[in-house]
Amino acid sequence: MEKLTRILAVANGIEDGALVLRKSVALARRFGAHIELLLFGLADDLEAATLCAVLAYDKVTVASMHPGVESTTDVILRRVFAAQPDLVVKSPAGEHPLKRWTLDDNDWRLANECPAPVLLVRHAPWASPIRFAAAVDVADDETSDTARSILHAAGFMALGCHGNLDILYSEREQHDDALRMERAEKLAQLVREFQVGCERIQVFDGAPEHVLPPVVSARHYDVLVLGAQSHQPALKNLLGATNSRLVQATEGDVVLVKAAGRAEGNGVHDESLREKRSYESEQFA
């Protein structure tokens, strides 16, 4: 994450739009970013314009979306590849009466295929200063690449928001001291690479999927930064289990970040280059 000049905010109706736009504007003010609001559902354009006026932020474009036969995720991805935002903001798609958070397959798919970080927001307001946490793993090359992207995004956002950042790492290796030291040095090197003066490394012992969720739950972070699920089957199961438990543990918002240069998809990127915009009518607020 090198910059934050364009935010793509996605909402399903006016009520959801109020939540998503409020937090998008809170970030945009800090970075001077432009917001494009994709408004799905039977939304009233006048209500959307009024909402933008109430927030008193004039760098907002409102687009009423009518996806037709396409899935909402396909429409979002098509717009992402066309507009190339630096951040996508939306509320989580999944719901469960017994869980704080539930991300459905569409959320995970969006995070895996979207080249920009995806911020999933809930109703809880942010503290001042904002409390960020980044959960990382440096067990091998792929998880280290993801950790680098996580620290880059988390450090950039924390610095721009004048927030606090905790870096959470749990070492699952309990016997090989040389391997433990190698990973500790790798983590320290990554932190130095993205040093912004406000982060704290916190190292725990044990399997991260068991150790870190209680830590996250007890500390009430405003924003938790995680890696999107891996495309390699073995790591996908491992990272998916850890991330799912961390997502369920937090009361705050979640940023899902993909390793730099990793792209997954089903052709939506190529289709976006054909300027297929018949499903969209744009207005300015």
Residue ranges and their predicted role:
Residues 57-65:
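A glycine-rich helix N-cap at a beta->alpha junction
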Residues 39, 66, 169, 202-203, ...:
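Residue-level recognition of beta-strand->loop/alpha-helix junctions
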Residues 164-208, 213-214:
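Glycine-rich phosphate/pyrophosphate-binding loop and the adjoining helix
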Residues 3, 74-128, 214-277:
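Gly/Ser-rich helix-loop-strand patches that form or flank binding pockets
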Residues 1-36, 102, 112-114, 125-168, ...:
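Short acidic/Ser/Thr-enriched loop-to-helix initiation segments
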Residues 17, 43-49, 142-144, 175-182, ...:
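Short, charged/polar "capping" segments at the starts of alpha-helices
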Residues 12, 43, 93, 137, ...:
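Flexible loop residues that form catalytic
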Residues 65-75, 204-209:
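Charged docking surfaces used in two-component/phosphorelay signaling
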